[in-house]
Amino acid sequence: MSELRDTRLEKAQALIECGQVPYALRFEPSHRTAELQQAHADLPNGEERDVSVAIAGRVMTRRVMGKLAFFTLADETGPIQLFLEKAALGDAFKQITSLVDAGDWIGVKGTLRRTDRGELSVKAAQWQMLSKSLQPLPDKWHGLADVEKRYRQRYLDLIVSPDTRDTFRRRAQLVSGIRRWLDERDFLEIETPVLQSEPGGADARPFETHHNALDLPLTLRIATELHLKRLVVGGFERVYELGRIFRNEGVSTRHNPEFTSVEIYQAFADYNDMMDLTEELISSVTQQVCGSTLINYQGTEINLAPGWRRATMHELVKEATGLDFAGFSSREDAAAAMEAKGLQTPALADSVGRLLNEAFEQAVEETLIQPTFVTDYPVEISPLARSHRSKPGLVERFELFIVGREHGNAFSELTDPVDQRQRLEAQQERRAAGDLEAQRVDEDFLNALEVGMPPTGGLGIGIDRLVMLLTDSPSIRDVIAFPLLKPESRDGSAAVDNGSTE
């Protein structure tokens, strides 16, 4: 590798001696390659078209055959062939064939011709080095076989893998589609703080940092919920934020400590309205991104057209296990029944409601393949959700499950400041008992609720998991451009990172 780099450095020096700049300031393409392919699809084989074009891109392949050479040049939209002829280029032919390597960025001006084999080509009249590559490209046929290297050196993955490029194009389309859908319905996006003195809005451990000038301990946000609710208190009736969230938790194929979510709040709505909104939003952006609401994920056909199943947590657990948690009067009774079914009963699950959630996670969650709204959660695990209007001990909450994974979480929001204080104080007691993911008491948020918050529906959707679904990606690392990885060791070799801490 070091010899190859030295050779390319020598070529960069030779370019300077020929009057070329190895790293140009600018170049002005007249077209992108896909535009040329489309606009001149009618050019017959073996014919030329006297139209001046200027294109720029990375040299992907090169073939030199005496007085002729053929390069493949690729820009963001795709490849096109360069036809290089000594008779047309003169001395520049020797320069481009001897000093340009696969991986270099070049600009070319010329006309168009289609080869006898039907390949649209730019017949070069002039060329310019734009950026001399000192490192070779990965093998064009096998790409990056090392999965970890794909994540660690994403730039190489993007160069050689059209599928990877398509994944991130679809991600961008999804994000812009969500924003457009919400904006068209009068939702206003407002940024909330990333650095917070009191993290809240989720059961999660935060990343901790310190503000030196203020000598103030801070955390990165674990949710946007509590600040967006403050905005509703302030009079914004439809508000959302799409952005980064940070949780100091394990890493797996479905978890990354830094991830993207959208949280949406609508005044005068409840969790039923948010179910309708979720269904309409996801089906709409799926149609935009995939061209259909019928998609394939890891060999399974998923139908995201509206009309998703809705079922309570109690119903689903009873259906899967035969256990009716409505009939248990104590934790001991529920635990004994679960253990008889072979289900685990962890000590932190210290109530019937928490055991119900355990039974759901162990016996039901992974079976929910088609989109399913799971509704009416235990109050113990939902400290920010409103108590159910007709079911004591439950709250008006749903989670959306698709392919066995949670994709959304929503409530009829708790707007009673007295009830909210009691819930958060109970969470604080759990923290003191060792539950480091339990929520904290946020006095300013409670003060905002005392000012008065209208009835509100709230929703959070994980963007990364939705991108996984719509791009048929098995791991969250496939849809995050630069996922968190263990650093390389000091000798330059990669520390082994199997992608999981679970």
Curated annotation (Swiss-Prot):
Mg(2+) 2 binds at residue 406. Disulfide bonds: none annotated. Its EC number is 6.1.1.6. Transmembrane segments: none annotated. GO terms for cellular component: cytosol. It is found in: Cytoplasm. Keywords: Aminoacyl-tRNA synthetase, ATP-binding, Cytoplasm, Ligase, Magnesium, Metal-binding, Nucleotide-binding, Protein biosynthesis. Its main location: cytoplasm. One of its GO terms (biological process) is lysyl-tRNA aminoacylation. CDD domains: LysRS_core, LysRS_N. It catalyses: tRNA(Lys) + L-lysine + ATP = L-lysyl-tRNA(Lys) + AMP + diphosphate. Its cofactor is Mg(2+). Mg(2+) 1 binds at residues 399, 406. Binds 3 Mg(2+) ions per subunit. GO terms for molecular function: ATP binding; lysine-tRNA ligase activity; magnesium ion binding; tRNA binding. It holds the Pfam family tRNA_anti-codon. It comes from the Bacteria. Belongs to the class-II aminoacyl-tRNA synthetase family. Homodimer. HAMAP family: Lys_tRNA_synth_class2. This is Lysine--tRNA ligase. It comes from Synechococcus sp. (strain RCC307).
